[in-house]
C-alpha cells in the first residue's frame, strides 16, 4: 500500500479555517460571519458544514471564497472509507454567485478538463440574467459526479440534472416583465454575430425583440455593471465548448435548428396571434423541427404548445448533457490508456490500475434557497430519516429538535415537496398531472416528426422506452442524499442591495447588512443546526466492530468492544468523540483523522494485516505532495511531524533523494510499498558494486572480444528466433476500416501463394512477417505496374491510339533530309522511301553515273514528275496513244534524274525503253525501301483548292488527288481531243469542288452511270487518276485521337517545366550572405548517440560548443541509446561520450525509470543522468547526458537500454512537454529537471528551440544564430533546416556520386518547398524546431498530439515500420505538418553543416533503402492532409504528388531515357524535341544554379552524378521497393492473425505495468527533497511571457560564482519570485512557508554525474588554476551556514544556500572553485557602455545612421561584442539617449 501524508492531514485539526464554538447563538454566528467575510475565509459550523460569504464582486475580483478543507475532507472519506459522498452547494440568497466550478477546483486531485468544457456548454441552458444575479441558475439541481478509484484519482465523471428538471416557467415561458430579466442565455448566444451568415440565413434569425419569449422584459444585453460581459464573446466560447464535446457539423446544425424552432414557436403562445402569421410561423417551425405543420396548427392548443416548448427545451438540455458525458468518458478512456493527462495537457504515464473498486463524490448545486433549505433542514433535524434514524437505532443519544424548528422543517419540505419526490400532496398530484400531460404532447410531436429525425432522437433517447423525459439521465436528489455521506457548503450574501450598487463601493467587502445575514441564518436555523450537530450528530465515520478492529488493529486496537474501548482510553478519546453503539462504532472527525494519520506514518511492513482491506489500496502517486514513506520511487519528506521525525531519521530519509535514490527506487528497504508494482530492475546491477571508475555503467563491452558487432547502421548482426502463440498471452486489438480494406486487397492479389510455401520454403515462420511479405509483394507489383503504365503511356499508348503515326511524314519532314547522305529520303506518288542503302549503288544502265553530286540534290524531294509512267499503260481502256504524255505544271530542276519509260525513252538500249518498266522493275524495287505515307494537312488541301492559283486538289476519303498536270496539259494544247482522255463529268468534280472531299459525289457519279459504256469509262478514268494523280493522304496525326496523348504529355511537361523553373528561381538568392545580429533565445542542442566512433562524436560536440552563440543560452543534450559497442570501438558509446565530456569516471548516478517507446515490457526503461560543463576553444557550455541503461533483465542482452533514435527524441520531447504543462514527471524526468533547473541553473521552461543534429554532424559556427534569427524574424516558423554538405566527398566513388545530389536536393527541392513554407522533410541531422508558438505559447513540437503519434509502440505493420522504423525524421515533419498546417517549415541555405556520407556500396544501399521507402510512406501520409498551402497547381499538395510519383517512377524514368537514347541513335522515330528540352532544362537550370553561385566544383560533381544516374534511378529504387519488409521483427509482440475487424497478438513477456513508473509533479518532488526552484501552479500559461516581475536570476547555477541569480546575470538587486501561475487550488493560501536549510545540501549533489569537480579543475578561466578543490571541499563549503537574512525566496542553489546570501560562498572562496558562468572574465560596465553610446551619437550623422550601425560602432569602441542582457541594455540605452537628444 502506497502510504502518504495528505495535504488535508497537515491541518486536519485546524479545520482549514475558523470553527464554531461549542454553543452557538445568532449573534455569535453573525459576528463570525462578518469576520470571515472581511478575511475571505470559510467558517465551519460542524465537521460537515461550511459557510462562505460571496458577492459577484468578490467572486470576480478576488476569486470566490470556497472551503477547500471540506472538499479535501469529502475526498479523504470517500477513498479511505470506500463510501460515496455528496457535497450540497446551497445558496441562502438569490444573489449569491455560483460556486460549482470554484468548488470543483479545490479538490486535491486534477479534474478532467472535459468537465469544465462540458459545464461551459451546459450552463448557458440553465443560466439567466436577473436584477439580483447576472448569472442566476434556473435548474432545480445540477450534479457533477466524480468517480474515484480507492487511490483517490479520477476514473470517471458525469453531469446530470435532478428529476425536478429546469424552471422553464421563469427562464423561458414567462420571463418576468420587469427590466433586468432575461431568458436563458443560450438564446441570446444564438442570435449574436457568433452565428455565421449562412446559419442566420438558414435559420431566418432576427433581433431579440422579434421574439415573444425574449421581449417580455425589454432587456436584451448583459448587465452594464459587468464591464467585460459580452454576448458575442460568450457565444464564441459557447460554440467552441459545444464543438469540444462533439456537437459540430450536421449535429450542430440540427441542434441550432431545434433551438431556433423553439424560439420561433414562442411567438405562437399568445392567444390573440394573427392567423396568417400563425400559419407562417408554424410552417417555419415545422421545417426547423422536422415535423408536420398540421400538428402545430391544428392538433395542439396554445397551452399544449407551451408545454411542447418547455418539454422540448428540457429534452434538448438532456441531450447536450448526454453529449457532454460522452466527451468526458472519451477523455477518461484516453487518460486510462496513457494518451492524455487528466487536465488535458501533456502526455501521461498511467500510474494506477484503474480497473478496481470505485467510489463517487457528487457535487450538487442547488441554487433555489427554498429547496436547499428543505434538503438541509430535513437532513439535520428529521430524526426519522437517514443517518439520524440509524444513530438513534444504534443507541446514540440525540436531543430532539424543538417543535418550532420541526414545524419550520416540515413547512419547508411541504413547499418543495414535488422536487423532493413527495407526490402525495396537492402539489405532487399537480406535478404528476403536468408530467403525464407533457408526455402525451411530446409523444404526439415525436410521432409527427420524420423518421430518424433529430427531434425523434431527442424525445426517444432510449429506443423502445417511449417518452422518458425527467427520468433518463437524471438523478434522484433525495435518494442521492440518503445513500451518500452528506457535506454542506452553504453560501450567504451580505446585502440585499442590487449588484449594480456593489460596483460603486470603495472596497469589495464594503457591502454588509447585518439584517440580511441574520435573516438568512435564522431562516435556515443555522445556530440550532450548529448546536445540534456539535452536541449529538457530528459523527463523520462509522464502522461495524470487526471492520474497526481490522482497520486499526495495527495501531494496537484489540478485538471486541472491550478492546476498542480500551484502545480509546489509551488514545485519550472520550465517549463523546467515539461512541460504541449496539452494532457500530461512531467516530467524530478529529479522532478518526488522528487514527488515519497514525496509519499513514506506520511502516508499511507492519500494516500487512490490513493489506487486503479494500480501504487501504494504493494511492495515485501523481497527487502526493509529501509521500512520507518513500512511496514508489519518491523519497520521504524532510518535514515529518511524526514520531519518526528525528534528526537521524531526517538524514536517513534525505539520502533517498538523488545520489542514493536507488535505495528507495528499487525497494531495498522492507518498509517501502509492498503493494506497488514490482520493479523489473532490481538494485543489484546499480548498487551491489562500489564505484569503480566506469560511470556506473559496468564493464560490459569494455574489452574488444568480438562477441558483439554492429554494422555501420548499428544493426545487430546476430539472429533472432521467433516463437508464436505457444505459452503466450493472446490479445486482440481492433483494426481500422482502412487496415481491413488493405488486408483484404492484399489477400485478393496474393491468395494464390500458399502460406506453407512462405513458411517452410521462404523461412517466414511468423504470420506477421508473411503478411508483411505479401504487402511488400503487392506494393512492388503496384509500383512496377505504375512504372510500366508510365512507360507504356509515354512510348506505346500514343502508338496504340494512332497506330501508323511513325509511318507518316509530311513534305517538311521529308525535306528535312535534304543533302543528308545518311538518311536519304524521297517521296514518290504519296509514298515516302528511305533509299539510304540504295542511292550509292550504280543503278543506272546508261552512261549517266550514280554520283554524290548527282544524287544528293534529290534527297528530301517529292519526285512524282520524275517517275511518271506512260499514259497508255497507266490509263488503260481510255484509247490513249503511246505518244501522248502530260506537260508538267512545274519545271523539273534535275532532268538527269527523270525516269522516262516507254516511247519517249532517250536510250533505246536502256531498260526504260520497256513500256512496263514502272510496274515490272521500279515498283518491286522501291517497295523494299518503303518508309511510310506522305501526308498533307487538310488545311493545305483546302488552301490549294481555294488559293489564287486554284490547284485542282481534292480528297477522296483520306486520299488526295491532284489533276493540275492534266488540266495544265489541256490548257497548253487548247483542249485538243487527243489529251481529253478522262471522263468529262469526273474532271468537272475537280474543277467545281477543289479542296473538298468528293468521295460521296464521285461514288454517286460512278454508281449512276447511264449505261455500261459510260460506267466502264468512269471506272477507267478513276483508275487512271489513281495511277498518275495520287499525292498522299490527309495527315491523320492531326486528329483528336492522335493528338490527345501528345497534348496530355505536353500539359504535364509544361507543368513539370514550370515547377522546375520555379524551383530554379527559388534557388536563386543573390546578394551577400546576411549577417544576422546575435540572438539570445535559449536553445537545446540534442544529439542522439548510438554506435558512432570517438572522432565523429568529438567533432559533433566540439562544433556545438564552438557555435557563435551565447554559451549560457545553449544546452547540449546527449542521449545515448543504450549501452552499445559500435563497430571499431573498444568500449560502449556512452563511455566514449562521457570520456569526451570529461566526466569523472567515479561518478555513479542512480538508474531511474522512465517510459520508453517499445513493445509491452520494453516500455519500462532506466536511465542515468550526468551534467556538467564542456570546454572547447575558450567556449564553456553546459551539457546534460542521459544514458539509457535498460532493466536488469536486459543486462545479459546485446544492447541493454536500446530503444531506437525515435525513443531518444521522445524522451526529450516528453520531458519538455511535461515541463510546459507542469505535469507529473517520471523519476528520470525529475532528475533531468533538477540537473537543468538547479545544477545548470536555467529553468527548462525558458528554452524556446530544439536543435536536432546527428552524432556525425559538424555544424558551422554561425549556423545556430542564423536559424534562430530566421525564427525570430518569422513567428510562423515551426521548423527550419539548413544546408547539409559532405565532409568526406572525395573519400570513395560512392561518396563522390552523392555530392551533387546533396547540393541540388537542398538548393532546388527544399528551396522550392520553403517558398510555400512547407518543407516536407526536415532532416534529423540538422533541423531546429520551435517548442512553443510565440503568440499564445501553444506547444508545437512538444504538443500532445505530435508526441502521441510519434511515440506509437505497436509498430506491427509494413506501413508503420516504414514510417516509424525507417523515416523517423521525415515522419516527425509529417506530424508537425499534420497538427500545425498553419505554421511554416523553412529552409535557409546560409545555415550549413557537414555530415559523413556512406563510403561503401552496402551502407549506401541500406541508407537509400530507408530513405526511399520512408519517403514513399510519408508522402502517402502527407497526401491525406487537408490543409496544405498554395493554390491551383502550385499547391503543396500537388508538389507532394509530383514528388511521390517522381520517387515511385524513378525506374521508368531511367527506362525512358534509355529509350530516348535508342531512338536518337537509331533514328527509328521522330526526334523527341520536347523530352530533350525538358531534360536540358532540368540539368541546365541545375547547372545555372551552381554557376551563378560560383560553385564551380559542382560541374565535375554533376558529370559524376549523371554517370551514376542508373544507380540512383534504377538500381537503388528497385532494391528499396523489394526490401520494404526488411526489418528486424521483435519477439515480444507477434501478430499471429488479422481476422475481420480484429488483430490477434501473442505477447511473450511480463507486460508493462504503468505503476512501475510513478509520476510526481516537480513542486511536490522539490518540496519532499528540499530542492529549490519550485514553480508554483500547474495550469498552462495563457501567454508565453513572464511578466514584468519575473527575472532570470532566480536560480543560481552551481557552476557560477557570480551574484545571486541564474547564469544570465540578471539584476542582482532584484529578488522576484517565479511567475505566478494559477493552480487548481489557486484560491487557497499555503499552510506553511518554505525556507532553505543549512542541511539542504545532500551527499547526492556531487554524485549525479554533474562533472563539477572535473570541469572546474580543467577550466582555463578559473582565477587560481593551481588550486583544485575536491568534491569533499565543495561539500564542506556547501554546508556553511547561510548569511543572515535568509528568507523564503526560491532563489537558492542546489548546494542549499539561503537566498538571503548574495553568494553561496565567502568571497575568498569564489574564485577557487567556480568559473563565472555569467560574466566570463568580466566585461564593460554599464557606465562604459553609456559613455560609448553618447560618444558615438555625438560623432555620427543622426539623419542617415541606423541603429545597427550605432551598435557596431559602440562595440568597436568597446572592443568587444555584447550579447545577452548586455546587448539588451545597450539597445535600450541607445533608444533612451536618442529620445533625450
UniProtKB/Swiss-Prot annotation:
InterPro entries: Chitin_synth (IPR004835), Cyt_B5-like_heme/steroid_sf (IPR036400), DEK_C (IPR014876), Kinesin_motor_dom_sf (IPR036961), Myosin_head_motor_dom-like (IPR001609), Nucleotide-diphossugar_trans (IPR029044), P-loop_NTPase (IPR027417). The keyword Calcium does not apply. Its EC number is 2.4.1.16. It catalyses: [(1->4)-N-acetyl-beta-D-glucosaminyl](n) + UDP-N-acetyl-alpha-D-glucosamine = [(1->4)-N-acetyl-beta-D-glucosaminyl](n+1) + UDP + H(+). It is a multi-pass membrane protein. It is found in: Cell membrane. GO terms for molecular function: ATP binding; chitin synthase activity; cytoskeletal motor activity. Induction: Exhibits higher expression levels in hyphae than in germinating conidia. Expression is increased in the absence of chitin synthase CHS2. Pfam families: Chitin_synth_2, DEK_C. GO terms for cellular component: cell septum; myosin complex; plasma membrane. Polymerizes chitin, a structural polymer of the cell wall and septum, by transferring the sugar moiety of UDP-GlcNAc to the non-reducing end of the growing chitin polymer. Shows additive effects in septum formation with CHS1, CHS2, CHS3A, CHS4, CHS5 and CHS6. Indispensable for perithecia formation and regulates conidiation. Plays an important role in the response to cell wall stress. Also required for hyphal growth and pathogenicity. Belongs to the chitin synthase family. Class V subfamily. This is Chitin synthase 7. The gene is CHS7.
